[in-house]
Amino acid sequence: MKMVVEKTEKFDPEEVIEEFEVLTKDAGKIQEETLQKILEENGGTEYLQQWGLNGKTDSLSFKNCIPIVTHKDLEPYIHRIADGDLSPILTGKPITTISLSSGTTQGKPKFVPFNEELMESTMQIFKTSFVFRNREFPVVNGKALQFIYGSKQFKTKGGLAAGTATTNVYRNAQFKKTMKAMQTPCCSPDEVIFGPDFQQSLYCHLLCGLIFRDEVQVVSSTFAHSIVHAFRNFEQIWQELVTNIREGVLSSRVIVPSMRAAMSKLLKPDPELADTIFNKCSRLSNWYGLIPELFPNTRYIYGIMTGSMEPYLKKLRHYAGDLPLLSADYGSSEGWIGANVNPELPPELVTYAVLPNIGYFEFIPLMENLDGLEPMPVGLTEVKLGEEYEIVVTNFAGLYRYRLGDVVKIKGFHNGTPELQFICRRNLLLSINIDKNTEKDLQLAVEAAAKILSDEKLEVVDFTSHVNVSADPGHYVIFWELNGEASEEILKECCNCLDKSFVDAGYVGSRKVHAIGALELRIVKRGTFHKILDHFVGLGAAVSQFKTPRCVGPTNLSVLQILSSNVVESYFSTAFC
């Protein structure tokens, strides 16, 4: 059963909820039907034929024939498609668009097939979470201040349109129709969203938000990082924005002709609005509650706030004041997994109900068998409450039994479908010896050490890590960018706290016997992490899709170079001396 994307500008919320309830009540049956449909559409492809599926469409034959794979296994097939091979390689119907992952995890963007079925899944997820969100936090005839940035699409060697997953969505006509149907159209014109320069687009987004300040009911972005980044910038440029509004003249920093032309239609002299914004900003204490002061009718802040976005929540709450933070849905460049149908939960507790008709899902239990082999994956309706799994996806765009690399925990069930909590990326491990520390472990260590800074009214702007094995024994390196100057004494204390906060038994044991060297804390110049963002944007990533890499591997030389060349101070832990 596939939800039909409506072509009209209004949709019935009750109908969307009813369809969701029907889908989730019989999740097991819907999963079998979804797999059958995927295999019927693509049974004649080179990939499925080579594994001897021979037109079978049942799940047992599928699992017996088709291996579990990573992106590396499918890369040669995807590159042939991108290079113009029109034969049915992964899908029966030709792939016309390629999505690029952000590339922040592995250091370079991955190519992923994108098609109209994935676009339909996107709109289904958006609508489903919206109707649940709108029951709790209704918005009516408002606008959304969306910090979204559509990078340029380009043509692959074979003439396919290629762009980041977010760009492919934003450029699709269905996206704008759906936003309009949700009564939260973006307050920025397309010329700003698709502008060629991120800093100029950000400036115009903020200006559009201020012009429509009374109509803004939602402040959002793909990721929480982009919202925090936008308002950190606002702190620096707010007086210039006020002057633009007072005089009705756009700043000379915006030089893209199409952007200037679009903004000139919106910007008119408004001294009264300029005075209001000036007075509100002048009265704020350390910018606390900035968002509701600027946009008084805002109902909530919306974006992906889990995983690598959690470290930005403290600053986001500072800007949001009493406004609720609502975490957006769960997906990746490869496709969507689930919708947030419990919007009242804070980001730290948010769960995602898997939509059983947008793909076929399997779950690898995160425990080794006694013989050391990885356990067999289980189906969507076979997962157990409280257990952790890695997700395996089969979708309508040519990915079959594809390891997503995400670790999730089963927190409950909505009818027959599980509600997942995102835990971490499985492959983001700090490991030298027998130690194994995940992104979550790193995050907890940074949070513990950052509490020492907060007493000094300082904060960690951003952070990442690296395993240095150039010397023996190897050691962990943590890079911090701070919002001010910290004393040597404080930073030494932070360094020791970081080292002691990794509580993994393998790490602690290895540190005690000096099989792992002392943890190193390196402080980098202000703006270093912005240089990393610029680097990935230069590679073709969209700002809206950017995630700071939490662990920089040895092959990610460009990012290591940016970090290393901007180090201003370095400290080694004395915790295990």
From Swiss-Prot:
EC number, as in UniProt: 6.3.2.52
Reactions accelerated catalytically: a jasmonate + an L-alpha-amino acid + ATP = a jasmonyl-L-amino acid + AMP + diphosphate + H(+)
GO BP annotations, alphabetical order: defense response
GO molecular function: ATP binding; jasmonoyl-L-amino acid ligase activity
Residues holding an L-alpha-amino acid: 166-170, 531-535
GO cellular component labels: cytoplasm
Keyword Nucleus: no
Pfam families assigned: GH3, GH3_C, GH3_M
Sorted UniProt keywords: ATP-binding, Jasmonic acid signaling pathway, Ligase, Nucleotide-binding, Plant defense
Induction pattern: Induced by wounding. Induced by oral secretion of the herbivore Manduca sexta caterpillars. Induced by treatment with JA-Ile.
Binding site for jasmonate: 102, 328-331
Binding site for ATP: 99, 119, 122, 163, 168, 331-336
Similarity annotation: Belongs to the IAA-amido conjugating enzyme family.
Record's function text: Catalyzes the synthesis of jasmonate-amino acid conjugates by adenylation. Catalyzes the conjugation of jasmonate (JA) to Ile, Leu and Val. Catalyzes the conjugation of jasmonate (JA) to Ile to mediate defense signaling and resistance to the herbivore Manduca sexta caterpillars.
Annotated protein name in UniProt: Jasmonoyl--L-amino acid synthetase JAR4
Organism of provenance: Nicotiana attenuata (Coyote tobacco)
Gene: JAR4
